[in-house]
Each structure stands twice: as C-alpha cells, then as structure tokens.
C-alpha cells in the first residue's frame, strides 16, 4: 500500500476522543466479483447475504467444517459482488480457505491493496465529514457510496465512520482534516472496536472459536434461517442444543504488560488465581488504562477479578453496548 500509515499515538477512550483520522493498516480489504458472487458467499459465511441491501454492512463469520472461525468479515456490497474488511494477519489464510471451492463458480476472489482504509471518529466526526461528502451514512442507511469512496457508519462505542477509498481521495481527506483532526494509526480503531464489543480475530485465534463464543449472534452476524454453509451444523447445534458455553467479555483496569492475542488470563478464586479465557485483543489507553477483549465462560460473575498472568494489577468486567439475552 503506497499510502503511508500515520504515526502512532496512545489511543483514547471514545468518551474523550477528539476528532481523529486513522489509517487502518492492521485491517485489510478483500473482494469477490463475478456472476456467482452472492451464491458463493451465501454458502461460505454465517450471515444471509441474499438479504443484504446496498445500504447495509454486517459482521459475518467464515468458518471451517467444525464451525470454528477462520476470520470474521465486515461485509458490504461492492460493484457486482462483495467486499469485506478483516484483520490483515488473517487475510491470506482466510482467502486461501475461501478459494477452495471457487474453481466451480464464476467468481474471482482477491485481496485489494489498491484502496485505502481510513477511520474517522471522535468529537463532531459527522460535522467534519459533512464538509467533504455530499451524503453521509447513518443508522437508516449504513453504507453510502460517492465516486471511488464507500463510507460505513458505526454506532458504537460512539458514532464513527470507516472510509474505503482510493489513494488520491485518502490524500485529499488527510490534507483537509490535518488541521482540525488528530492523526493516529490502527491502534485507536482497535481500541474503539474493543469498547464496542466487536470481536477481533487475529492469526493467533484463527480456527479457535465458534461464532457464538465471540457474541456474533448478538451482533446480527448469524442467520439461523438460511440454507447451508460451511460449518453450519456446528453453529446451529451451539444455538439449539445450548452447546456454546463461552462469550466475549470486555475487561478494563491496569496491567504492567499488555497480554497478547491467544494468551490466557487469571481469575481470582478466594486467595488463589486460576487460569481462564483467551485474549483476542488488548490496548493501553493514554490515561494508563488497559482494555482487554477476552473469550471466557459465559457465566462469569460480574464482580469477578482478573489479572494478566502473575501481574500485581487487576482487571474487571465492563458492560458491553449490547445484550446477550436471546
């Protein structure tokens, strides 16, 4: 990608975030084009893509035959097919898996590094973009296309926008916003996704979890009414037989080091500590607070105390902006 990522600054929680323009270099874009695109994706992901309109984007999972996620995909219609955004660390293996059956279909599946991914969030993000685009996405119309640019709207943790565009437009936006907006890199967007409870699947956790273990059903990413797709049997069993005992949790507090994706944490049990969970992502904010996204048992007590392994500091559960009640 020729567009240079912005230098990192310590991320800020959404409630205190000034207007910020971010390069999303840790995320990557991929596309499927061709006459069979919709039919092909319908047989591969957990969401009902046949019901998706041009105005929608959604988080879907791409699973193996056992229902474990290769990755999750932020999916939207693009040209005569679909595009999706996923963590850069999983794109290549995810595309390899997706292409396995493509030889029998009229589709082309490819990474897209020509386009640039930017995020805009923070104080008066909408007002800042309203000067630059004739229409912005909203709750009613979550995807808007203008020229070479696609804008995606997100409600949580606070209104923000993901921009998929060409290099020239990315440079124009940077020049226009440079004076009023702080510039930051992917870590700020990652912090917002953790706060929003959007599961982050990096390479360390690819092939490890069924979608429900990361709350995908609560985010509208699983259709239980559509026809078959890879891994469907296991995903359905988890719902209808209550086979899923895990959920995605948000922890905040302090830690002397950031836990890495794939690492476990420790849960306080009386005087002792017991290993628990799998970390998906963690970020340290500019106020020193650590935010951790972790998959753990879905029956954790809300006042449980956790820590990074052998650490002197502690972490506690924070509520997510959505409900897991079915």
UniProtKB/Swiss-Prot annotation:
Gene Ontology BP, a term: tRNA processing
Protein's job: Folate-binding protein involved in regulating the level of ATP-DnaA and in the modification of some tRNAs. It is probably a key factor in regulatory networks that act via tRNA modification, such as initiation of chromosomal replication.
Annotated gene: ygfZ
Family annotation (InterPro entries): GCV_T_N, GcvT/YgfZ_C, tRNA-modifying_YgfZ, YgfZ/GcvT, YgfZ/GcvT_CS, YgfZ_barrel
Protein's organism: Escherichia coli (strain SMS-3-5 / SECEC)
Molecular function terms, GO-annotated: folic acid binding
Residues the entry annotates as binding folate: 27, 189
PANTHER family referenced in this protein's UniProt entry, alphabetically: TRANSFERASE CAF17, MITOCHONDRIAL-RELATED (PTHR22602:SF0)
Family note: Belongs to the tRNA-modifying YgfZ family.
Major localisation: cytoplasm
One GO location term (cellular component): cytoplasm
Localization per record: Cytoplasm
Top-level lineage group: Bacteria
Keywords from the UniProt entry: Cytoplasm, Folate-binding, tRNA processing
Protein name stated in the entry: tRNA-modifying protein YgfZ
